[in-house]
Amino acid sequence: MSMPLSFTSAVSPVAAIPTPRAAAETRTAASLRHAGKSGPVASPSQNTLNAQNLLNTLVGDISAAAPTAAAAPGVTRGQQSQEGDYALALLAKDVYSLNGQGAAGFNRLSDSALLGFGIDPASLHDAGSGFQAGIYSNDKQYVLAFAGTNDWRDWLSNVRQATGYDDVQYNQAVAAAKSAKAAFGDALVIAGHSLGGGLAATAALATGTVAVTFNAAGVSDYTLNRLGIDPAAAKKDAEAGGIRRYSEQYDMLTSTQESTSLIPDAIGHNITLANNDTLTGIDDWRPSKHLDRSLTAHGIDKVISSMAEQKPWEAKANA
């Protein structure tokens, strides 16, 4: 696998989202400018100044209490779970919706913002193939997230790629990652769930980018070879910390991939999330109950719930 590359963007970054304090100050300045057009502005009284100072203080307190981009932990290479991985799980869920706006301090880049970075918004969504992705930013880090399996076209992508055939969604994922890498360099992280996890792993290996995946689809050696990637070297680097892959206990996809050599395993260092859905009594003898549990375990909502409860990034969990 190639070493991570560093690029310097030649375009202007997305304008920072104004804080409540900045917005209040902007509105005050605009009011004064407007008043200046219609006549001289009288000096504000001491009461007015006191009221404005109080307003600014209150706005500042509200801003400080709210989650900020600076408070969101960055995601870096490594085998151990990181707190920022939880934010990526939330984004891996958000990207399933075309109207998703982001989560955990990350905002989804608008079409105009993407164009400003030289990225074609149309390259992130293809109704024909089922491909769907989004790019998010907290002004410090950028996340390229891929949606997973949500219709029959995605299942076809799973089967084609796993059995060694060329698949358009994987090609689109690599192309999107190359564009994002050129724009954001080492500030880019890639994430995805299910099929999206397989896309994320492939895109990460093709661009030398850190990735975090959730209940990810496996990536075949045929796919890696086709992209000019040495499978053995890529898997070794991913296991060493290039890719962290979270798998929920009882997840049907992970269990199936690891129980047969006919389909590939997910790539990366595995972090297992314990599943607290215990089957007892007669339920433990009913295949339908086990199937229901494995299907639920595969969903991104269950992954998010387990991460929130277990906090695997804490030191005692990583010891």
Curated annotation (Swiss-Prot):
It is an enzyme of class 3 (hydrolase). It catalyses: a 1,2-diacyl-sn-glycero-3-phosphocholine + H2O = a 2-acyl-sn-glycero-3-phosphocholine + a fatty acid + H(+). Residues 1-24 form the signal peptide. InterPro entries: AB_hydrolase_fold. GO terms for biological process: lipid catabolic process. Its EC number is 3.1.1.32. Keywords: Hydrolase, Lipid degradation, Lipid metabolism, Signal. GO terms for molecular function: phospholipase A1 activity. This is Extracellular phospholipase A1. It comes from Serratia liquefaciens. The gene is phlA.
